[in-house]
């Protein structure tokens, strides 16, 4: 369907980044961005890791908008990418008899990691407004010996305003391949009538997933301690949280009413994953809500709202 004269053309934003290990041990980058995506000033962490914040200057997506992010991490490089703010997906536009729901907004992430690379992708949450249509695709290729850490938190509807997903829909496709084997292949499609299902969202508006593909298989005791610590990190957080092993690495799931709880738990897991690798402890990202930093580092006592699933 073509745009009418009264409609602005959809956004086609993109980011392309290549990370390489420099002679001085720091990670350097090359690439660029196309509006409305923008690369903010990066900085180098104490361990030489390149820290890169991404900004979506349009503030959100509507039906027809597309964002494409392509990442390549060369051998030995270390990088961490996050976003400056939550990604907002507004109600769809372009409704017609042919497309009664309207057009979809699309976000695509492609990442390729060479052996020895370490890439962390931890953006802030995505908020899907009532009536919004979002299709998200993530394709990750990890060479043996590389480390991938990725997290995704999605809120379905602005629940603080009493809003649900309405006529909206969220679709997510995630595939992670390590060498010649698939580590994760997922397809998810959610709409409002499915959310109360106890085998799905159970009436909760927030879902989150954290996946770590380790460079090498962990020893049994090492993995057991990592999972035990991750379960202890649920202390004081509301929602249902589960964590389990991958070959090699781990996967953690969150389902509940608080994107803050998901973010705090994932940050605690991030610290443990860094420690297992013998890497420096991560700092609370500068672009994340600063008032949450103390909660992330010093958990509150457990509450009756916490559900600890394995």
From Swiss-Prot:
Cell membrane in keyword set: no
Subcellular localization: Cytoplasm
Source organism, top-level taxon: Bacteria
Keywords: Chaperone, Cytoplasm, Nickel insertion
Pfam families named among the record's database cross-references: UreD
Record's GO cellular component terms: cytoplasm
Disulphide bridges, residue numbers: none
Translocase as UniProt keyword: no
Signal peptide: none
InterPro entries per UniProt: UreD
GO molecular function, one term: nickel cation binding
Main location: cytoplasm
Task of the protein: Required for maturation of urease via the functional incorporation of the urease nickel metallocenter.
PANTHER family cross-referenced by the UniProt entry: UREASE ACCESSORY PROTEIN D (PTHR33643:SF1)
Subunit structure, as described in the record: UreD, UreF and UreG form a complex that acts as a GTP-hydrolysis-dependent molecular chaperone, activating the urease apoprotein by helping to assemble the nickel containing metallocenter of UreC. The UreE protein probably delivers the nickel.
Family, as annotated: Belongs to the UreD family.
Name of this protein: Urease accessory protein UreD
Source organism per UniProt: Synechococcus sp. (strain RCC307)
């Amino acid at each position: 369907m073509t745009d009418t004269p009264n409609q602005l053309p959809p956004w086609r934003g993109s980011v392309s980044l290549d990370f390489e290990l420099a002679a001085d041990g720091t990670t350097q980058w090359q690439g660029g961005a196309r509006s409305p995506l923008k690369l903010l000033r990066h900085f180098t962490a104490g361990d030489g890791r390149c820290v890169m914040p991404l900004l979506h200057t349009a503030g959100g997506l509507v039906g027809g908008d597309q964002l494409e992010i392509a990442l390549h991490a060369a051998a030995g490089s270390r990088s961490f990418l996050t976003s400056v703010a939550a990604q907002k997906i507004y109600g769809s536009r372009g409704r017609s008899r042919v497309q009664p729901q309207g057009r979809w907004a699309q976000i695509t992430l492609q990442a390729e990691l060479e052996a020895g690379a370490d890439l962390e992708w931890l953006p802030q949450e995505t908020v899907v407004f009532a009536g919004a249509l979002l299709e998200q695709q993530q394709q990750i290729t990890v060479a043996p010996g590389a480390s991938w850490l990725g997290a995704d938190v999605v809120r379905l509807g602005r629940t603080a305003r009493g809003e649900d997903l309405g006529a909206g829909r969220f679709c997510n496709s995630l595939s992670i391949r390590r060498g010649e084997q698939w580590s994760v292949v997922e397809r998810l499609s959610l709409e409002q009538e499915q959310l109360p299902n106890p085998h799905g969202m159970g009436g909760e508006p927030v879902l989150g997933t954290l996946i770590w593909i380790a460079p090498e298989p962990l020893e049994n005791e090492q993995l057991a301690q990592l999972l035990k610590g991750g379960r202890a990190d649920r202390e004081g957080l509301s929602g249902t949280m589960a964590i389990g092993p991958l070959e090699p690495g781990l996967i953690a799931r969150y389902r509940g009413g608080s994107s803050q709880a998901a973010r705090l738990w994932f940050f605690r897991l991030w610290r443990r994953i860094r420690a297992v690798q013998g890497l420096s402890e991560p700092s609370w990202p500068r672009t994340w809500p600063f008032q949450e930093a103390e909660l992330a580092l010093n958990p509150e006592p457990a509450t009756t709202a916490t559900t600890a699933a394995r």
